[in-house]
Curated annotation (Swiss-Prot):
CDD domains attached to this UniProt entry: ABCD_peroxisomal_ALDP
Top EC group: translocase
Keyword terms, alphabetized: ATP-binding, Glyoxysome, Membrane, Nucleotide-binding, Peroxisome, Repeat, Translocase, Transmembrane, Transmembrane helix, Transport
Function of the molecule: Contributes to the transport of fatty acids and their derivatives (acyl CoAs) across the peroxisomal membrane. Provides acetate to the glyoxylate cycle in developing seedlings. Involved in pollen tube elongation, ovule fertilization, and seeds germination after imbibition (controls the switch between the opposing developmental programs of dormancy and germination), probably by promoting beta-oxidation of storage lipids during gluconeogenesis. Required for biosynthesis of jasmonic acid and conversion of indole butyric acid to indole acetic acid.
Gene designation per UniProt: ABCD1
Localization: Peroxisome membrane; Glyoxysome membrane
Name of the molecule in the record: ABC transporter D family member 1
Length: 1337
C-alpha cells in the first residue's frame, strides 16, 4: 500500500483529492463553524433582551465608554450585573482593547497569528516525519532513519523557538492589555476627584485599588492566554480537518463535531457560575488586603492603643471568610473537573481511538499482507493518530472556552464596573457645570459667595440650611462651631468634593473644584512621596511651575515656617515618605509653606495649624494677611479672632449666624449671642458655648484685663550635651542575611505537617494518586501497543474488547486527575493558612507590625508579602511538589520498564542525558529568583501608591493633586511594565533552550532507542505474529521512553521553577526573620524598665534616641505621682511624641531606668494602669460601641462592666449596663447625637474615619480614655481639633475620674490642669522640668 504521506503523489491519491475538493472545503467550513459555535454558544445563551448595544471596537476608548453608559447612565452597575449578567462586560473590554491596541498591538497580534500558523504547519510536518521514523525503525533502515532524525531534530528546535516566541508574544500582549486598561481607568479615576468620590461619596465600589492592581493584570493575563489557546485550536482544526479529508472520509469530522458539541452541551448544563465565584473571591481578597494596608497606615496609633489583639481578630475573620469561599470554589472545580475530564479528555480519547483505528479495519487504509505494507500502515497510524488527536484537542479547547470565558467575566464585570462608574462620576462634574452655568449656578468672580446653599452629607444628613454669605477679596472669614457641625463639609461643597444640592455659589476660577485662585490647606496634612522641593510646590510638578523655585526661595519659604533645618537633614534630590519622617506639627508647617509659595487670592485654612504653638499660628495668620491673601479659616482657637473681620457660626443642626467685627467694640456681647437662635438641642447648646468662648476671648484681647494666671519654677534641667560622646546604640532588630538553603529549611519546618493531621493525609493521598496515575499511564502505553498489534493482525474482536477496557481506564483517569489537581490546590490553600498564621503570630505581637514599617532600615512591604506574595508562593510550591513527586515516581517505574526492554544501555543513555541537560540549563539560566522578587516588589509599590491615594483622598482632592498623584502612580506603573518586559525577554531566550532540552530533544533519543531495539529484535520477520510483537514493543517502548524523558524533562524544568520560587521565598522569609528578631529582642530591650509601680511613673537618666540615632532628650529624669499631672511642651519635632513612644515600649529604653504602671489593657477599668490616646486619631472597624471600648471586644467590655458596676447579672443585663455606661460617656464628650444619627444605634457599622470629623474622632479617643479609666492617661495632642471649651470639659471629666495626665499640647488653656511642665528645648537633647503654680490676682 502506498504511503499515506505520499498519497497525493500517486494516481490514486490525485484521483481521491480531485474527487473530494468540495468535501474538503465543506469539512473545513464545518470545523470552523462548529468551533465558532462552541466558542460563542455561552455568549448567545447569556444575552438578554434588554442588553444595551455593544461597541464595534473601532472607536476610541472615550466613545466606547460613552456608548456603554449612555443607555443607562444612572442605573447602578450592580443592578445591571444581576439583570444582564453574561459576558457583556467581557465583550465591552475586548472591544476597547481592540480599538486601543495601536500599531504595535496589532503587530503583536499578527505576529502571534503567524507564529501559531507556522507552529501548526511545523507540527504537521513533524507528525509526518515521525511516521516515517516509525516505518524506518520497523524496517531497520538505518541510513534513512539517520536522515529523518536529522530533519526531526531541526524541526524540534524550530518548534521550541516558536513555542517560546508564542509565550513571549502572549506575555507582551498581556502587558499591553494591562497598560491599556490601566491607562483608561487612570484617565477617569484621577479626573475631577473621582478617586475621592468613588469611595467617599458614591459608595458603589469598594477597594478600587484591588481592581486596578489585581483584577486588571489577572484579566489581561488570562485573556491573552485564551487568545493563544483558541488561535491554536482554530488553526489546528482547519489544517487537520483538511488533512483528514485529503485521505479519509469527511464523516470522521462530523463524528468528532457531534461528540464535542454533545459533550460540551452536557458540561455547560453542569457548570457552576465560575464568573460569580471568581468575582466574589477577588472581593474577599480585596477586603483582606485592605485590612493589612489599614494596619500599615495606622500602625503607630494601633501600637499606642495596644490594639494588636483586636486588629488580629478582624484580620483573622476576613482571612477565614476568604479561605471558606476558596474551599467552596475548589470543591466546585473538583466535581466539575471530573465530569469535564471524563467527557472531553478521557472518554474522548477512547472515541478518538475508535476513529483512528476504524479506517484501518474496514477502510481503504487497511494494510496488505506484505511486510512493506504493514510498515506503511504503522507510518499511517502514527500520522493519522496525530491528526485525530489534534482535532479532538482543538475542538475540545474551543468547547471549554466557555468555562474560561465565564471565569474571565468575573474579572471583566469588576473592571467594567470601575470604568463605568469612574466615567460617570468624572462626567458628572462636566455635565453639571455646563448644564448649570447657564442658570448662573457656578460662576467666576473675585469673591466667594454662598446664596441659599444647603450642605448635605452623602448619607443624607443636613448640616447647613440656606446659607447666604459673601466674602470679598481682602476680607477674612472665621468659621466656628462644634465638631461635626459642617465646617469642613461646607468646603467640600465649595471644592466640588460633594455635590451642591441647592443654592448658588460664586467663586474665582472655572469649574466646580478648587483651583489656583483658591488654595486649601487641609485638616489632615498630606505629604506626597518625593523630594523636599516637591512638597513645597505640590500639587505642581517641576514642568508646571510658572516661576521656578530656586534654592534661595526654598530657604526663605522654610525659614518662614521654622523648618530650614530640613535642608541639612535631607539631601535635595532624595525621595522621602515625608508622612513617616515628620511630626504632625512639622507637616502642618510644611503645608503653610506651600501656601506661601502659591500665593492664592483666597486661602482656606481648615484647622491646619492645630498642632503648632499659638504664637506660631498667629505669626502665620499675619504673614498670610500681609501677603494679600484673604483667609477663610476654620479654627477652635479664639486668638485668631483678631485676624478676621467676619465670623460664621454653625450649630450642627442646620442653623447658622454671621457676625461682623466692628473696630470700636468687641465682637459680640453675651446678649447678642443668646439672641442669635434659641437653643433647643444639645448640638445648638454646644454652638452657643463655642460662640461665648470666642466672644470672651475677644473681650480679653481687647481690654487685656487679665494677667497670666500661672508661673513656673525650674526644678531640673538636662546636663550639657557633649556631642563628641558616642550615643548608645538604638537596639533595632538585628537580622543576618541567611542563605537560601537555610530559608528553605525554615519554610519546610513550617509547612511539613505530621502524618496524623489533615494536611499530612492530603500529602499521603497525593502520593497515592501519583502512583495510581503512573500505573494507569503504563496501562495506557501498553494498550496503545496492543491496539497497534491487533490492527496489524486485523483482530477486530480483540480490539472491541480493548475498547471496553479503555472506557474503564477513562473512568479511573477522570477521577484521579481532577482529584490530584484538587488536592494540589488544597495543599496550596493549607500552606497559605499555615504560613499566614505563622507570620501573623509574630507580626501582631509586641508591636512587631510597627517595627516592620518604622524600624526595619530597608523597606519591607509586609502588607504585600502577607497577601499577594504569600498566595503566589504557596501556589507555586504546591505545583512544585507535584512537579517533583510525579516525575520521580514516573522515573522509578518507567526506568524499570525501560530496563526490561532495552537493558542497562538504554537506562545509561537516559541518565546521562538527564545529567548533561541539567548541567547545561544551570549554566545558561538567568537569576530568575532576584528578577521575580523585584517584580513582586514593584507590584507592591504600585499597589501601595493606590492604597495611599485612597487613604489620603480628601486631602489630595482639596489640593487638586489628582494630576500630581497620577504622575507618581504612572511612574511606578511604567517601572513595573519595563521590568516585566525585560523579564519576558529573558524568559524567551531561556525558554527556547529549556523547551528544546526538556521536551523536544528527548523525542529524538526515544527514536534512537527504538531503532536500537528493532535492530536487536529476534525472530522471523516474515511472520505476522513476530511483526505484531515488534510493532507492539516499538509502540510500547516509545511510550515508556517518552514517559521517562517527560519525567526527566519535568525534573530539569524544576530548576527554573525553583529559581523563580526563590524570589518569593526570600521575600517571605526576610519578613519572617525580621519578625523573629523583633520578638527575640523584646526582653533584652526592656531590661532597664520596671513595671512594678501603680502609683508612680518616673524617668531616671533615660536617653530618648530615635531609630536614626538622633538624641531628642539627654538623661531625662522626672517623676510623676498620682494626682500631679505633667505637661510636655516644646517646638514641633523636639521629641514630645518620642518620649511617649519610649513610655509605651514602642521604642526601647536605650539607657537609664523607667518605672511605670502596667500596660496590660485588661488591668484597666478600676483606676489602675496606663492608657494612651495618640496624636493621630484611629477609628477601628466595627460598631459605634466598638469605637469606645477599643481595643476590647464586646464580650470583654461586658465582663468588665459587669465586674465593676454589678454582680452576677446575666449577659443580657451586662450588655444593657455597658450600653448605659457608654451613653454617659458619649454625653461627657458631647457625641450622644451619634446614637440618633443612624438607625442602628450602638450597632451601627460604617466607615467612621470618613463619617466623623477630626474633632469628633478626637473626642471618641477621649471617650475611650473615660471608658478604660486608667490611673495615668497619656494624651499626645489628642484634643487640638476640638474647641477650647470642649477641651477643658474633657480634661475636667478625666480629672474628676482620678486620671493623672501626661499631656503633649501647644494650648495654654490646658496649663491649669497640670502641676509639672517638661519643656523640650530644641530637639537636640536639652530639656527643662518646671513646676506649675497657679496664681490669683
Amino acid at each position: 500500500m502506498p504511503s499515506l504521506q505520499l498519497l497525493q503523489l500517486t494516481e490514486r491519491g490525485r484521483g481521491l483529492v480531485a474527487s473530494r475538493r468540495k468535501s474538503i472545503l465543506l469539512a473545513a467550513g464545518i470545523v470552523a463553524a462548529g468551533g465558532t459555535a462552541v466558542y460563542l454558544k455561552s455568549r448567545v445563551a447569556s444575552r438578554r433582551p434588554d442588553s444595551s448595544r455593544l461597541c464595534n471596537g473601532q472607536s476610541d476608548d472615550d466613545e466606547t465608554l460613552e456608548k456603554l453608559t449612555a443607555t443607562d447612565q444612572n442605573a447602578k452597575i450592580t443592578t445591571k450585573k444581576k439583570k444582564g449578567g453574561g459576558l457583556k462586560s467581557l465583550q465591552v473590554l475586548t472591544a476597547i482593547l481592540l480599538s486601543q491596541m495601536g500599531k504595535m498591538g496589532a503587530r503583536d497580534l499578527l505576529a502571534l497569528v503567524a507564529t501559531v500558523v507556522f507552529r501548526t504547519a511545523l507540527s504537521n510536518r513533524l507528525a509526518k516525519v515521525q511516521g516515517f521514523l516509525f516505518r524506518a525503525a520497523f524496517l531497520r533502515r538505518a541510513p534513512l532513519f539517520l536522515r529523518l532524525i536529522s530533519e526531526n531534530i531541526m524541526l524540534c528546535f524550530m518548534l521550541s523557538t516558536l513555542h517560546s516566541t508564542s509565550k513571549y508574544i502572549t506575555g507582551a500582549l498581556s502587558l499591553r492589555f494591562r497598560k491599556i486598561l490601566t491607562k483608561i481607568i487612570h484617565s477617569h479615576y484621577f479626573e475631577n476627584m473621582v478617586y475621592y468620590k468613588i469611595s467617599h461619596v458614591d459608595g458603589r465600589i469598594t477597594h478600587p485599588e484591588q481592581r486596578i492592581a489585581s483584577d486588571v493584570p489577572r484579566f489581561s493575563s488570562e485573556l491573552s492566554d485564551l487568545i493563544l489557546d483558541d488561535l491554536t485550536a482554530v488553526t489546528d482544526g482547519i489544517l487537520y480537518a483538511w488533512r483528514l479529508c485529503s485521505y479519509a472520509s469527511p464523516k470522521y469530522i462530523f463524528w468528532i463535531l457531534a461528540y464535542v458539541l454533545g459533550a460540551g452541551t452536557a458540561i455547560r448544563n453542569f457548570s457552576p457560575s465560575f464568573g460569580k465565584l471568581m468575582s466574589k473571591e477577588q472581593q474577599l481578597e480585596g477586603e483582606y488586603r485592605q485590612l493589612h494596608s489599614r494596619l500599615r497606615t495606622h500602625s503607630e496609633s494601633i501600637a499606642f492603643y495596644g490594639g494588636e489583639t483586636r486588629e488580629e481578630s478582624h484580620i483573622q475573620q476576613k482571612f477565614k471568610n476568604l479561605v471558606s469561599h476558596m474551599s467552596h470554589v475548589l470543591h466546585d472545580h473538583w466535581w466539575f473537573g471530573m465530569i469535564q475530564d471524563f467527557l472531553l479528555k478521557y472518554l474522548g480519547a477512547t472515541v478518538a481511538v475508535i476513529l483512528i483505528i476504524e479506517p484501518f479495519f474496514s477502510g481503504h487504509l487497511r494494510p496488505d499482507d506484505s511486510t512493506l505494507g504493514r510498515a506503511e500502515m504503522l507510518s499511517n497510524i502514527r500520522y493519522h493518530t496525530s491528526v485525530i488527536i489534534s482535532l479532538f484537542q482543538a475542538l475540545g479547547t474551543l468547547s471549554i472556552s466557555s468555562r474560561r470565558l465565564n471565569r474571565l467575566s468575573g474579572y471583566a464585570d469588576r473592571i467594567h464596573e470601575l470604568m463605568a462608574v469612574s466615567r460617570e462620576l468624572s462626567g458628572d462634574d462636566k455635565s453639571s457645570f455646563q448644564r448649570n452655568r447657564s442658570r448662573n449656578y457656578l460662576s467666576e468672580a473675585n469673591y466667594v459667595e454662598f446664596s441659599d446653599v444647603k450642605v448635605v452629607t452623602p448619607t443624607g444628613n443636613v448640616l447647613v440650611e440656606d446659607l447666604t454669605l459673601r466674602v470679598e477679596q481682602g476680607s477674612n472669614l472665621l468659621i466656628t462651631g462644634p465638631n461635626g457641625s459642617g465646617k469642613s463639609s461646607l468646603f467640600r461643597v465649595l471644592g466640588g468634593l460633594w455635590p451642591l444640592v441647592s443654592g448658588h455659589i460664586v467663586k474665582p476660577g472655572v469649574g466646580s473644584d478648587l483651583n489656583k485662585e483658591i488654595f486649601y490647606v487641609p485638616q489632615r496634612p498630606y505629604m506626597a512621596v518625593g523630594t523636599l522641593r516637591d512638597q513645597l510646590i505640590y500639587p505642581l510638578t517641576s514642568g508646571q511651575e510658572s516661576e521656578l523655585l530656586t534654592e534661595i526661595g526654598m530657604v526663605e519659604l522654610l525659614k518662614n515656617v521654622d523648618l530650614e533645618y530640613l535642608l541639612d537633614r535631607y539631601q535635595p534630590e532624595k525621595e522621602v515618605n515625608w508622612g513617616d519622617e515628620l511630626s504632625l506639627g512639622e507637616q502642618q508647617r510644611l503645608g503653610m509653606a506651600r501656601l506661601f509659595y502659591h500665593k492664592p487670592k483666597f486661602a482656606i485654612l481648615d484647622e491646619c495649624t492645630s498642632a503648632v504653638t499659638t504664637d506660631m499660628e498667629e505669626r502665620f495668620a499675619a504673614k498670610v494677611r500681609a501677603m494679600g491673601t484673604s483667609c477663610i479659616t476654620i479654627s477652635h482657637r479664639p486668638a485668631l479672632v483678631a485676624f478676621h473681620d467676619v465670623v460664621l457660626s454653625l450649630d450642627g443642626e442646620g442653623g447658622w449666624s454671621v457676625h461682623y467685627k466692628r473696630d470700636d467694640s468687641a465682637l459680640l456681647t453675651d446678649a447678642e449671642i443668646d439672641s442669635v437662635k434659641s437653643s433647643d438641642t444639645d448640638r445648638q447648646n454646644d454652638a452657643m458655648v463655642v460662640q461665648r468662648a470666642f466672644a470672651a476671648a475677644r473681650k480679653e484681647s481687647a481690654t487685656n484685663s487679665k494677667a497670666q494666671s500661672y508661673q513656673t519654677q525650674l526644678i531640673a534641667r538636662s546636663p550639657v550635651v557633649d556631642k563628641s560622646v558616642v550615643l548608645p546604640r538604638f537596639p533595632q532588630p538585628q537580622t543576618s542575611q541567611r542563605a537560601l538553603p537555610s530559608r528553605v529549611a525554615a519554610m519546610l519546618n513550617v509547612l511539613i505537617p505530621t502524618i496524623f493531621d489533615k494536611q499530612g493525609a492530603q500529602l499521603l493521598a497525593v502520593a497515592c494518586l501519583v502512583v495510581s496515575r503512573t500505573l494507569i499511564s503504563d496501562r495506557i502505553a501498553s494498550l496503545n501497543g496492543t491496539t497497534v498489534k491487533y490492527v496489524l493482525e486485523q483482530d477486530k474482536a480483540a480490539f472491541v474488547r480493548l475498547i471496553g477496557l479503555s472506557v474503564l481506564q477513562s473512568g479511573a483517569s477522570s477521577i484521579i486527575a481532577p482529584s490530584l489537581r484538587h488536592l494540589t490546590q488544597r495543599l496550596a490553600l493549607g500552606w497559605r493558612i499555615r504560613l499566614t498564621q505563622h507570620l501573623l503570630r509574630n507580626y501582631l505581637r509586641n508591636n512587631a507590625f510597627y517595627k516592620v514599617f518604622h524600624m526595619s532600615g530597608n523597606s519591607i512591604d509586609a502588607d504585600q508579602r502577607l497577601t499577594r506574595d504569600l498566595e503566589k508562593l504557596t501556589a507555586d510550591l504546591s505545583g512544585l511538589l507535584t512537579g517533583m513527586v510525579k516525575p520521580s515516581v514516573d522515573i522509578l517505574w518507567f526506568t524499570w520498564r525501560m530496563k526490561l526492554l532495552t537493558g542497562q544501555r538504554g537506562v545509561a543513555i537516559l541518565y546521562t542525558y538527564m545529567l548533561l541537560g541539567l548541567g547545561f540549563l544551570r549554566r545558561v539560566a538567568p537569576d530568575f529568583g532576584d528578577l521575580a522578587g523585584e517584580e513582586q516588589q514593584l507590584e507592591g509599590k504600585f499597589r501601595f501608591m493606590h492604597e495611599r491615594l485612597n487613604t489620603h483622598a480628601e486631602s489630595i482632592a482639596f489640593f487638586g493633586g489628582g494630576a500630581r498623584e497620577k504622575a507618581m502612580v504612572d511612574k511606578k506603573f511604567r517601572a513595573l511594565l519595563d521590568h516585566s518586559l525585560m523579564l519576558l525577554r529573558k524568559k524567551w531566550l531561556y525558554g527556547i533552550l529549556d523547551d528544546f532540552v526538556t521536551k523536544q530533544l528527548p523525542n529524538n533519543v526515544t527514536w534512537g532507542l527504538s531503532l536500537l531495539y528493532a535492530l536487536e529484535h529476534k525472530g522471523d520477520r516474515a511472520l505476522v505474529s513476530t511483526q505484531g510483537e515488534l510493532a507492539h514493543a516499538l509502540r510500547y517502548l516509545a511510550s515508556v521512553v517518552s514517559q521517562s524523558f517527560m519525567a526527566f524533562g519535568d525534573i530539569l524544568e524544576l530548576h527554573k521553577k525553583f529559581l523563580e520560587l526563590s524570589g518569593g521565598i526570600n521575600r517571605i522569609f526576610e519578613l519572617d526573620e525580621f519578625l523573629d528578631a523583633s520578638q527575640s529582642g523584646v526582653t533584652s530591650e526592656n531590661q532597664t524598665s520596671r513595671l512594678d509601680s501603680q502609683d508612680l511613673l518616673s524617668f531616671s537618666e533615660v536617653d530618648i534616641i530615635t531609630p536614626a540615632q538622633k538624641l531628642m532628650a539627654s538623661k531625662l529624669s522626672c517623676e510623676i505621682v498620682s494626682g500631679k499631672s505633667l505637661l510636655v511642651t516644646g517646638p514641633n519635632g523636639s521629641g514630645k511624641t518620642s518620649v511617649f513612644r519610649v513610655l509605651r515600649d514602642i521604642w526601647p529604653t536605650v539607657c537609664g531606668r523607667l518605672t511605670k504602671p502596667s500596660l496590660d489593657i485588661k488591668e484597666l477599668g478600676s483606676g489602675n494602669g496606663m492608657f494612651f490616646v495618640p496624636q493621630r486619631p484611629y477609628t477601628c472597624l466595627g460598631t459605634l460601641r466598638d469605637q469606645i471600648i477599643y481595643p476590647l471586644s464586646k464580650e470583654e467590655a461586658e465582663k468588665r462592666a459587669a465586674k465593676l458596676y454589678t454582680s452576677g447579672e446575666s449577659s443580657t443585663e451586662a450588655g444593657s449596663i455597658l450600653d448605659s455606661h457608654l451613653k454617659t460617656i458619649l454625653e461627657n464628650v458631647r457625641l450622644v447625637y451619634l446614637l440618633e444619627r443612624d438607625v442602628g444605634g450602638w450597632d451601627a457599622t460604617t466607615n467612621w474615619e470618613d463619617i466623623l470629623s477630626l474633632g469628633e474622632q478626637q473626642r471618641l479617643g477621649m471617650a475611650r480614655l473615660f471608658f478604660h479609666r486608667p490611673k495615668f492617661g497619656v494624651l499626645d495632642e489628642c484634643t487640638n481639633a476640638t474647641s477650647v471649651d470642649v477641651e477643658e470639659q474633657l480634661y475636667r471629666v478625666a480629672r474628676d475620674m482620678g486620671v493623672t495626665f501626661i499631656t503633649s499640647s501647644q494650648r495654654p488653656a490646658l496649663i491649669p490642669f497640670h502641676s509639672l511642665e517638661l519643656r523640650l528645648i530644641d530637639g537636640e537633647g536639652n530639656w527643662e522640668l518646671r513646676s506649675i503654680e497657679q496664681t490669683t490676682e
